[in-house]
A protein has these predicted regions:
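An N-terminal alpha-helical hairpin/helix-loop-helix interaction module that forms a charged
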Residues: 1-141, 160-251
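Internal, hydrophobic cores of structured domains that mediate oligomerization or house catalytic pockets
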Residues: 151-156
Length: 251
């Protein structure tokens, strides 16, 4: 495992005088937002027997994050390209693998399973496609699977590996709304040290402690916790801001 150059940890994780605010936001999210169902819907099936394929339950789960897979894409994912998707998921790191334990090449190399899956789901025509010893290229026209939607579907299948490239989160991280560079940025952030409860620790350990305190219905990964906290603290929507204002702590 190699480590990226140092990156700036978001301010909410550097506020030693108010370090519980991030924990409180995470806990409040699971009380007030339907997004908690993205993680809990069919949780055990998703990470065990169905970890190597995309199911109709996965497509329903992403709707809990305010997106919908277009009908033409549903058919492609569940039928037309299902075998290719299964082969790519089978070649990718498993559902329990955290992003900080994989090498950068597994996240950036165009012929690695995760990159191939991203390009296939996005319909990035001409991108290399390698699976089961076969090598071809992605073909076909775009069918509504944008970067945010694809990131949510891939995060559902690999919650410890793929961050959700929501515009609020990518903007907060100084990245383009397309999410380009998000995987490497998230990996680097997880390895950065922060101070929490008087101790220095990697951000992923600090987020694990936040998850323990939040007591979600099902366990979530540190990467998912990072997505939630950054989304909640930076979301400008009035309804979200109103809920955020009721969370103990200051911002």
């Amino acid at each position: 495992m190699t480590r990226s150059a140092e990156v700036q940890v978001p301010e909410i994780f550097r506020r030693e005088n108010d370090e519980t605010y991030a924990d409180n936001l995470l806990r409040d999210y699971f009380r007030n937002f339907d997004g908690h169902l993205f993680d809990s819907l069919g949780h055990e099936r998703n990470l065990e027997v169905d970890s190597g394929r995309v199911t109709s339950e996965d497509l329903l789960a992403v709707q809990m994050l305010s997106v919908k897979v277009p009908a033409r894409a549903v058919k492609r994912i569940l039928e037309d390209e299902a075998e290719i998707i299964e082969a790519l998921l089978g070649g990718a790191p498993g559902p329990e693998t955290p992003i900080w334990e994989v090498d950068e090449a597994q996240l950036t190399d165009a012929v690695e399973p995760l990159s191939c899956l991203w390009n296939l789901l996005r319909r990035n025509a001409g991108a290399p496609l390698r699976y089961d010893g076969k090598q071809s290229k992605v073909t076909g026209e775009r069918d509504g699977m944008g970067p945010t939607l694809v990131s949510k579907l891939m995060a559902r299948k690999r919650p410890g590996l793929i961050p959700i490239s929501d515009g609020v989160v990518t903007t907060a991280l100084g990245l383009p709304r397309s999410g380009k560079g998000h995987w490497l940025r998230a990996r680097a952030l997880m390895l950065e040290d922060v101070t929490y409860e008087g101790k220095r620790m990697p951000l992923h350990e600090r987020l694990e402690k936040a998850v323990e305190k939040a007591e979600p219905r099902v366990p979530i990964t540190p990467l998912r916790a990072l997505d939630i906290i950054l989304w909640y603290v930076n979301n400008p929507a009035p309804s979200t801001a109103d809920l955020r204002a009721k969370v103990s702590g200051t911002w």
